[in-house]
Curated annotation (Swiss-Prot):
Domain of life: Viruses
Keyword field: Capsid protein, Cytoplasmic inwards viral transport, Disulfide bond, Host cytoplasm, Host nucleus, Host-virus interaction, Late protein, Microtubular inwards viral transport, Phosphoprotein, Ubl conjugation, Viral capsid assembly, Viral penetration into host cytoplasm, Viral penetration via lysis of host organellar membrane, Viral release from host cell, Virion, Virus entry into host cell
Protein name, UniProt field: Pre-protein VI
Miscellaneous comment: All late proteins expressed from the major late promoter are produced by alternative splicing and alternative polyadenylation of the same gene giving rise to non-overlapping ORFs. A leader sequence is present in the N-terminus of all these mRNAs and is recognized by the viral shutoff protein to provide expression although conventional translation via ribosome scanning from the cap has been shut off in the host cell.
InterPro entries assigned to the protein according to its UniProt record, in alphabetical order: McpVI (IPR004243)
Annotated site residue numbers, Cleavage: 27-28, 212-213
The keyword Phosphoprotein is assigned to this record: yes
Family from the record: Belongs to the adenoviridae protein VI family.
Residue ranges, annotated region (Amphipathic alpha-helix essential for membrane lytic activity): 28-51
Keyword Phosphoprotein included in the entry's annotation: yes
Lineage, opening ranks: Viruses, Varidnaviria, Bamfordvirae, Preplasmiviricota, Tectiliviricetes
Domain notes: N-terminal amphipathic alpha-helix domain is essential for the membrane lytic activity.
């Protein structure tokens, strides 16, 4: 790949901020890089394909292939694979038969270990042992005597209650008077209108603009 493609070309516009970066028009081209990579890969593939074809068509390779086929190596490998598969099948069958035999022996052993049926003498002994004397009944607990009910208190009817009348000469004691504090007025801050920000000078007005100031649309050319 030519290194001259990485440098800007004379007479073409430059859109980058600094000379020599990849943003410049006419600088580094991704399309040329992709085409060069694809051409290199195609050349490597064609070279490998032609080399393999030449080796396959050579006389030495043909003789080696015929000798390999006549030696019977493939037949021996096939027979060995068949014997291996048959031996694995026999091993699996023997394993399954041994597991079934173990389960059968375990089931028969559990049946033999069960207790024999009870005889008449054993049944009679069990009945005699169960017919034991019951414990003597506990003494009867006397019933508790209910406590006497207290007499009901007759309530006073509301009509019979009379308020106490005080004599006119007797004064009523009153506490000191407490003056309640007057509520303070809550000062609500008035809404003041905000002052509009005024622009002072063209410099502050151009700060919010995008680009490089006044000349952000200008073009620079490579020389």
């Amino acid at each position: 790949m030519a290194y001259s493609r990485l440098a800007p070309h004379c007479g073409l516009p430059v859109y980058g901020h600094h000379i020599g970066n990849s943003e410049m028009s006419g600088g580094f081209s991704w399309s040329s890089l992709g085409s060069s990579l694809s051409s290199g890969l195609s050349r490597i593939g064609s070279f490998l394909g032609s080399t393999a074809q030449r080796i396959g068509n050579s006389q030495g390779f043909q003789q080696a292939k015929e000798g390999f086929l006549k030696s019977g190596v493939l037949e021996n490998v096939g027979s060995l694979a068949g014997q291996t598969v048959s031996s694995l099948a026999d091993i699996g069958r023997l394993k399954l038969e041994s597991d079934l035999q173990k389960l059968r022996e375990r089931a028969l052993g559990a049946q033999q270990q069960q207790l024999p049926p009870l005889t008449q003498e054993q049944l009679a002994q069990l009945l005699a042992s169960t017919q034991t004397e019951l414990p003597s009944s506990a003494p009867a607990v006397p019933m508790p005597i209910p406590a006497p009910v207290p007499p009901l208190v007759t309530g006073v009817r509301p009509g019979q209650m009379r308020p106490e009348v005080l004599p006119p000469d007797r004064g009523v004691a009153l506490g000191p008077l407490i003056e309640e504090p007057a509520p303070r007025p809550i000062a609500v801050p008035g809404s003041r209108p905000r002052k509009r920000k005024r622009v002072r000078g063209w410099g502050s007005a151009l700060e919010d603009m995008l680009g490089d100031g006044v000349c952000y649309r200008s073009k620079r050319y490579c020389y």
